[in-house]
Amino acid sequence: MMPRILLSLCAVLSGLLTIQVYAQSLSTDVRSFDDMIDAGTLKVAVYENFAPYSFTVDGQAKGVDVELAEQIAQELGVNLELLWVVPGEKIDDDFRNFIWRGHYLRKDIRADLMLRVPYDREFSNRRNELGELVNELVVMFGPYQRERWLTVYNSRRIKSLETVGVFQYHPVGVEEDSVPSFYLLTAFAGRLSSNVKHFVSPTAAFAAMQDGEVDAVMAMRGVLEWLLSQTNNAQLKKSEAAYPNLGQAIWEVGMAVHESNRQLAYAVEALTEAMIADGRMQALYDKYHLSYEKPEMYQ
């Protein structure tokens, strides 16, 4: 009996050692703050084709997050290298590919800092079936914006939009597999579902509204405000409608680093706090014709 117990104990200890060695190997290639400063380059991950936050025009990077990354790099006295993120099915995939492990095709590419990630205690503290933190190798910090859902409508088709109940009678465009899609399909006991039209992106839904295919679009406020700024159609209006039973209609956007690189997180958070306090963050959003709402801790 005793040898069997010892063998089992050895197996457990061996497994724990393997996990520890694996975890250490994941941190080995993560640049420290000092290494990043010495290299003279800050690698920042931003989402690809995500106007107004990070996108390209004629090969030139633009957007709120791009300019925020430029400002951070400038304040740190280093050059900026952007890493463009093609979003995975879940943000956990993006953390794995750009923060703690690297993409399976390019494990040598890893970001020092990632922008536009959820800043939410419940999300950060999620645990798997074994009770382990889902993203134990990631630190989410530094909220710099509050985002929310918004509906834009064609006022020639809908006189006023005070409740989403109006979509019992008017078609509304949403991005497929999005929160607005799930919400509108189930709201009012499913009575809106026949008028919910799906598109590959909010941009495609917005174009369909301009063409008269749908009478409204529900998507992220920043995205819709940007699209509104790119059109001269005065008939398109923002709705102040509430979204009953939506759940999280407002959320905060922050940043992420590898858990071993908290020194960078402290430095970057100090910089963004200063930008929020002195109005530079507001000015950055104004430049892209966006409403800017401070995170709760700064209000």
Protein language model annotation of sequence segments:
Residues 93, 117-132, 183-187, 210-211, ...:
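A ligand-binding cleft/hinge motif common to bilobed small-molecule-binding domains
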Residues 8-18:
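Bacterial N-terminal signal peptides
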Residues 48, 144-150, 221, 229-269, ...:
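Periplasmic-binding protein-like
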Residues 24-27, 69-75, 153-158, 169-171, ...:
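Extended ligand-binding regions for polar small-molecule ligands
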Residues 25-120:
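Extracytoplasmic small-molecule ligand-binding "clamshell" domains
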Residues 46, 62-75, 146-191, 197, ...:
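Bilobed "Venus flytrap"/periplasmic-binding protein-like clamshell domains
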Residues 82-164:
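Acidic, polar ligand-binding/catalytic clefts
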Residues 80-90, 174, 192-201:
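Short beta-strand-to-loop elements that line the ligand-binding cleft
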